[in-house]
Amino acid sequence: MRVKGIRRNYQHWWGWGTMLLGLLMICSATEKLWVTVYYGVPVWKEATTTLFCASDAKAYDTEVHNVWATQACVPTDPNPQEVELVNVTENFNMWKNNMVEQMHEDIISLWDQSLKPCVKLTPLCVTLNCTDLRNTTNTNNSTANNNSNSEGTIKGGEMKNCSFNITTSIRDKMQKEYALLYKLDIVSIDNDSTSYRLISCNTSVITQACPKISFEPIPIHYCAPAGFAILKCNDKKFSGKGSCKNVSTVQCTHGIRPVVSTQLLLNGSLAEEEVVIRSENFTDNAKTIIVHLNESVQINCTRPNYNKRKRIHIGPGRAFYTTKNIIGTIRQAHCNISRAKWNDTLRQIVSKLKEQFKNKTIVFNQSSGGDPEIVMHSFNCGGEFFYCNTSPLFNSTWNGNNTWNNTTGSNNNITLQCKIKQIINMWQEVGKAMYAPPIEGQIRCSSNITGLLLTRDGGKDTDTNDTEIFRPGGGDMRDNWRSELYKYKVVTIEPLGVAPTKAKRRVVQREKRAAIGALFLGFLGAAGSTMGAASVTLTVQARLLLSGIVQQQNNLLRAIEAQQHMLQLTVWGIKQLQARVLAVERYLKDQQLLGFWGCSGKLICTTTVPWNASWSNKSLDDIWNNMTWMQWEREIDNYTSLIYSLLEKSQTQQEKNEQELLELDKWASLWNWFDITNWLWYIKIFIMIVGGLVGLRIVFAVLSIVNRVRQGYSPLSLQTRPPVPRGPDRPEGIEEEGGERDRDTSGRLVHGFLAIIWVDLRSLFLFSYHHRDLLLIAARIVELLGRRGWEVLKYWWNLLQYWSQELKSSAVSLLNATAIAVAEGTDRVIEVLQRAGRAILHIPTRIRQGLERALL
């Protein structure tokens, strides 16, 4: 009976075991995903970083000091790379572009730095006795410049002949000097017609530009350091703000000429197809409208006067340069623009403005007032700062059919009368003014108008008025730079990517470290590809970052060499150094992370970190075949730091395991077992074995006592010893005999340490054999509990189904009753409304009937 019970129990065990094995097989069938690290993925994020410059400075005159200090820039790349990003859409915003702010700060810094070694004109802040310069001619050159009267002579009072007392080379001696100054540069003292002072003496420190300084704009290319990239929008009608579908990546921008001008944008880039107007908000009249022309309009400017300049000593080692005299007729500086070309340009601008302002009448008017830099078109021409009246350009009205009415003449050219100003309030900053020394001889310059800066008049009734008035604007040089940088943005390269795969790091091995970088132009070309396609080209994508850093170092050394005679770095040299340090920092940071994760020198690195479905529950096929790396990075962006920390913890644990494995290598050779240095280990092992045996004997002694107590008696000894045979002089008695048997002794059959071990092991096996019923009882209890538990679960499940059905029926009945009640109430309300409506409709009829009865 007992054997049959055991067989029945084992049959139940077999069923439960089969079920458990099936569950394990089902669980193991769902394949686990693991985190895999990829280095060189085409992922970027918006960033602000220090840009450096590239320029062809050697192509320009080296005798003069260029204010832009482009000799400190790196040479431009003769074959610039531009990689088109297929299937990539990126957001741009020209109005919130750090490149604009950076260029503005750079240009101001360059101007300030170029003026540092120059002469301060503080001694000239004295009383000037000025009289109007008479329009006389020099007898030797009386016919030199009388060929054209249409250019106009200078108005009376526009130039002053001023005399003043100045300190000579000897400080305690004064002498009287004279200079020809423009009216715009002096201001009357106490409304006196003869006493004047320089215009900025009471507010600014006037610095004279050094004699050999040049303001000629040289194209400057802004470049991103290694680890960063510049994205370029190639949409031909891009408004400057919003998404761009035609995106490419470049290392440097195009050559941007830092032309400091107002109202008209000169010598910039052109729109490719149509005229484009850009504004941060067209409905806000406080926002400047930047007009980007598709065809340039040439403007030719001249100062016909042949000026002679002289040098006045104003102290030891300091000289003031001023106009000595003017040879020939003193004529007005002016600029000429083709009337037909300008009118055609305005027509195209008007058509674009009407698209924004609902076909209203467009009126162009002159500036409403302000500083001379804003009221007039200010720019530098051949070293002189011209201030031209642009009212002939902005004096027209355009009706709905793009016809216009102007009040100017019908000559072929539009002539702008210009004034020259020598004291310049730089960048509209308080406390900074520059004196531009006069240029000898005649001055001629030709520029291309490539854009306009417009402002729109506001008012309360602009919505009802059919006219929009636009005026030339400017003054904030950021708009000048923004007109060229509108299509660029700086991004930082994030070459490290993590994604789930089926591969797991199986073994711990020591990897050889290698220096591998990321070519930000090359691998961004795969940005529009799926993750699977991009991961195939990781080797190509991860090559030239380190070489880019080395090239940056060479560029920096070349820049320092070019400026070693100055013993100081310009803003460009500092930016070169910052860019290199930043590139090295980025590279070392990425390599440090790879080292923390045990992935140094690897492009694809498997790990032992399991992928958590809460990070992303997308399938592998959906991830690798349908998503780009940029999309995937946005998907897991919130969990990146967590994944990085898990990778670091996993690698730390793996290194500990590796250390333990390496510590076991010293046992690989059998001869090392007999090394004297290992004897201490042998002693420790022996002590542990002896301690274990003693502990085992104590345990079995306790178990034996418990067993004997359970049987109802306690032995006198823990081991039964066989009787010790008596000697020949003391023979043993027989059964019937009495005697002193209490004095007999017994001993073990075998003595020694091994005998103790044998006895203990034998007792262990006997104990296990005698208590096998305990296991069967426990198994039976577990089986009964499982069966009862299963029956209880089934009962609860049936009960739950019953009550859920009852609740469902009750809910349906309640909803039906509610619907019926609502329907009946709705019908009553509708009926009441209908009766009320009929009563109202019948009121005229009732009134008519009442009147008829009254009349009858």
Swiss-Prot record:
Region named Fusion peptide: 514-533
Sites carrying sugar chains: 87, 129, 135, 140-141, 146, 161, 165, 191, 202, 246, 267, 281, 294, 300, 336, 343, 359, 365, 395, 401, 405-406, 413, 448, 465, 612, 617, 626, 638
Region (V1) location: 130-161
Region V4, residue ranges: 388-418
Renumbered ranges of motif Di-leucine internalization motif: 855-856
Positions on the Cytoplasmic side per record topology: 707-856
InterPro entries attached to this UniProt entry: Gp120_core_sf, Gp160, GP41-like, HIV1_Gp120
Essential for CD4-binding: annotated segments: 421-433
Position of sequence motif YXXL motif: 713-716
Region (MPER) residue spans: 663-684
Disulphide bridges, residue numbers: 53-73, 118-210, 125-201, 130-162, 223-252, 233-244, 301-335, 381-445, 388-418, 599-605
Chain residue ranges for the region called Disordered: 717-744
Region (Immunosuppression): 575-593
Molecular function in Gene Ontology: identical protein binding; structural molecule activity
Something else known: Inhibitors targeting HIV-1 viral envelope proteins are used as antiretroviral drugs. Attachment of virions to the cell surface via non-specific interactions and CD4 binding can be blocked by inhibitors that include cyanovirin-N, cyclotriazadisulfonamide analogs, PRO 2000, TNX 355 and PRO 542. In addition, BMS 806 can block CD4-induced conformational changes. Env interactions with the coreceptor molecules can be targeted by CCR5 antagonists including SCH-D, maraviroc (UK 427857) and aplaviroc (GW 873140), and the CXCR4 antagonist AMD 070. HIV-1 lineages are divided in three main groups, M (for Major), O (for Outlier), and N (for New, or Non-M, Non-O). The vast majority of strains found worldwide belong to the group M. Group O seems to be endemic to and largely confined to Cameroon and neighboring countries in West Central Africa, where these viruses represent a small minority of HIV-1 strains. The group N is represented by a limited number of isolates from Cameroonian persons. The group M is further subdivided in 9 clades or subtypes (A to D, F to H, J and K).
Official protein name in the record: Envelope glycoprotein gp160
The species this protein was found in: Human immunodeficiency virus type 1 group M subtype B (isolate MN) (HIV-1)
Gene name of this polypeptide: env
